[in-house]
Amino acid sequence: MAFRNRMYQLSNVDDADADILNSHFAPNPRGQNHTHGRRRNTLALCTTKDQMFVYGSTPAGGAEWCSEALERSRPRAAFKQQRRRHVPRWISDSFRTCLPKPSGILKEQTVNEEEGNSRHRGKYDCDERIGVAESMNYWHGIVRTEEDGSKTLFLIPESWEDVHLKEGLVAIIDLAVDRLHCSKLVLFVDKNNSSLPYLVKSLHWVGFEPLPHLNCSDHALFGMEL
């Protein structure tokens, strides 16, 4: 069945070319904390509707998110012509079923549900779709602006098999705070995943807590205040 509600029609985000990940890029010369002339490894990318952020290593040995470096390293036309990434149907269905209402209330939503009250449509239109590419995983997300003006990032990975899950989650937390300006992060976890016990331990290690939800039978939700 076609999705009639734009809230659930996850816009395909610009895919990350394989040659970008693990490549080198120059630091942003505008930043005050970068060492000029040093090149850094690209560890992950985040694409939004209008921007692309690069997660790269630092001379000190850590990693951080920055913007604009990719724009300078490749022509804007090439950036615009990147292929579009297919959004798996199960990910769209997961957001469709378990994504809270803009008020923060988790409510049952079925594939036959109506478009919703007109007073909510403006809030749905404000939801921004993003994609985060790592070398071992790809995350589909929605950034929602809540009624109080705060932002929440909802994420579903294409795979939970990433052996570097903790490092990836730390990078995503930095992204949510420093670049997307979110105050809360929520992850959707498949309850049928064979690695669920390990995942729960990893999520608790990073600082996530289970969230109560209604009628979300296939997924467990884990959240963190940022």
UniProtKB/Swiss-Prot annotation:
InterPro entries named in the record: Acyl_CoA_acyltransferase, ODC_AZ, ODC_AZ_sf
Domain of life: Eukaryota
A molecular function (GO) term: ornithine decarboxylase inhibitor activity
Any one annotated GO CC term: cytoplasm
GO biological process: ornithine metabolic process; positive regulation of protein catabolic process; regulation of polyamine biosynthetic process
Function text: Ornithine decarboxylase (ODC) antizyme protein that negatively regulates ODC activity and intracellular polyamine biosynthesis in response to increased intracellular polyamine levels. Binds to ODC monomers, inhibiting the assembly of the functional ODC homodimer, and targets the monomers for ubiquitin-independent proteolytic destruction by the 26S proteasome.
Subunit-structure text: Interacts with ODC and thereby sterically blocks ODC homodimerization.
Family of the protein in this entry: Belongs to the ODC antizyme family.
Protein name: Ornithine decarboxylase antizyme
Originating organism: Schizosaccharomyces pombe (strain 972 / ATCC 24843)
